[in-house]
Curated annotation (Swiss-Prot):
Belongs to the TrpC family. Pathway: Amino-acid biosynthesis; L-tryptophan biosynthesis; L-tryptophan from chorismate: step 4/5. It comes from the Bacteria. It catalyses: 1-(2-carboxyphenylamino)-1-deoxy-D-ribulose 5-phosphate + H(+) = (1S,2R)-1-C-(indol-3-yl)glycerol 3-phosphate + CO2 + H2O. GO terms for molecular function: indole-3-glycerol-phosphate synthase activity; phosphoribosylanthranilate isomerase activity. Its EC number is 4.1.1.48. The gene is trpC. Keywords: Amino-acid biosynthesis, Aromatic amino acid biosynthesis, Decarboxylase, Lyase, Tryptophan biosynthesis. It comes from Hyphomonas neptunium (strain ATCC 15444). This is Indole-3-glycerol phosphate synthase. GO terms for biological process: L-tryptophan biosynthetic process. Pfam families: IGPS (PF00218). Gene3D superfamilies: Aldolase class I (3.20.20.70).
Length: 265
């Protein structure tokens, strides 16, 4: 039986085929070269984390396979500005439409409205998606180790690096962490959500954190819903956090809650 991740990767293959048919590689490379300059994603995180505050990557998504509808009518720019006002280091913007309700149009609109770095959050399976991401202004891309093999992970990483982008490498278990650490990116995410079973456990970050050396930057992802979650994960060394669903639901107090999480200790 196929998992949620399997089904996503299946339609990503269709999307990549359509992209290659619709736009030539040369066209995308020219657009990437003409895009606005890269904003340093990792350096923005470090500027806050090195001061012993919590560097937050605040996420925008209208829905998800695990939560269903989160905020289907959301104005992405309004949410992004709330995050920026609250002190977010960076943004994560879902560009997957079928499962998360996002788009590259959302990404571009948000990019024009904020000054902080942005991650294109999607399921990358081909270098052409990386080039497309830079063409739309992305500063960082995501590599999900559970979705691809080591050869492809290396190709995606190298493509992003050539374009000057940062790379967030996402893991969920020990085997994926070992594979991720073979890549040179310092940004190592631990997703507390199992993308195959769609269950969440903060203990995942606690278990995997000791595998990272001091030259890597641990980013705890998923399941962070209050200051207590952050305080718990700070005990294993995390100062960088990706938070989405809970913040999306905070309404008029969203900026205030970002500040509260940033200062939690």
């Amino acid at each position: 039986m196929k998992t949620a991740l399997d089904r996503i990767i299946d339609y990503k293959r269709d999307e990549v085929r359509a992209l290659k048919k619709d736009r030539s590689l040369g066209e995308l490379e020219n657009a990437a070269a003409a895009a606005s300059p890269v904003r340093g994603f990792g350096s923005a995180l470090s500027a806050i984390a090195d001061a012993d505050q919590n560097a937050l990557i605040c996420e925008i998504k209208r829905k998800s396979p695990s939560a269903g509808d989160i905020l289907p009518g959301a104005d992405p720019v309004e949410i992004a500005l709330d995050y920026e006002r609250g002190g977010a280091a960076c943004l994560s913007v879902l560009t997957d439409m079928p499962s998360f309700g996002g788009s590259l149009a959302d990404f571009e609109t948000i990019r024009a409205a904020v000054s902080i770095p942005m991650l294109r959050k999607d399921f990358m399976i081909d270098p052409i998606q990386i080039i497309e991401a830079r063409a739309h202004g992305a500063d960082c891309i995501l590599i999900i180790m559970s979705a691809i093999d080591d050869t492809l992970a290396g190709e995606l990483h190298d493509c992003a690096s050539r374009l000057g982008m940062d790379v967030l490498v996402e893991t969920h278990d020990e085997a994926e962490m070992e594979r991720a650490l073979r890549l040179p990116s310092p940004l190592i995410g631990v997703n507390n959500r199992d993308l195959k079973k769609m269950v969440t456990d903060l203990g995942t970050t606690e278990r995997l954190a000791p595998m990272l050396s001091s030259d890597r930057q641990l980013i705890a992802e998923s399941g962070i819903a209050d200051p207590e979650s952050i305080i718990r994960l700070r005990k294993v060394g995390s100062r960088r956090f990706l938070i989405g669903e809970w913040l999306m639901k905070q309404g008029t107090s969203r900026a205030e809650q970002v500040t509260r999480l940033k200062l939690a200790c």
